[in-house]
Amino acid sequence: MIFDVIKNLFKKDENTEQIEYLGVDKDGNKIYEGYYHEFKGIPWVFNKTTYTREEFDKAFYECLEEHNVNHDNLPPLVEPEILVSYEAWIESKSQLHPNEYLYEDDELEEYDKEDGMWQVDIYARFKADNGQYFTTEEILFKIHNAMANKELGDHVFFENLAYDDHEFDADDADDVSDDDEGTPVFVVWLGS
């Protein structure tokens, strides 16, 4: 009996967090709290089209089918709200949506412009439609439409949506409120 207690003590990994299994979504995907899948292998190409959700889903599923990607294997992102960081070129702050903020919100200086645009890092806040988690389709739809009115250069191929940090330093972006600490931040990686 004492041997079993000692054995179990050494089996524990102090750095391992318990991941709570939350069940399955409407499509049968397993949902876990506090675990972030890699969002790689999704062959999406960002463009200037602003989609309705129905239009996006149709184009997205056609793209997956063309590249033999099974949409049933796309993982959910189990967070009710996230911040997404991405790089883009803008002509003015008016291109930012109400849920977007510049990482460095100091004045955009004329001398920093290149071909009439500024290269900026943008944070976008997204909330899950169901209040609990994002499907892969939902988060890519929201990211796509946020980027559609901005210039991405030749970096238009989706490579990954990678977890960056769980704490957000509100001092880095003046427009982000102090209650943002604890909101997970993800970075969109695009390739050419």
Language model regions located:
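Residues that form ligand- and interface-recognition hot spots within folded domains
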Residues: 86-88, 130, 143
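Low-complexity, charge- and small-residue-enriched intrinsically disordered regions
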Residues: 1-16
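Short amphipathic, charge-patterned alpha-helical segments
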Residues: 132-149
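Intrinsically disordered, low-complexity regions
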Residues: 24, 29, 35, 42, ...
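Composition-driven low-complexity segments enriched in polar/acidic and proline residues
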Residues: 13-126
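Ordered hydrophobic segments in well-structured contexts
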Residues: 83, 138, 185-187
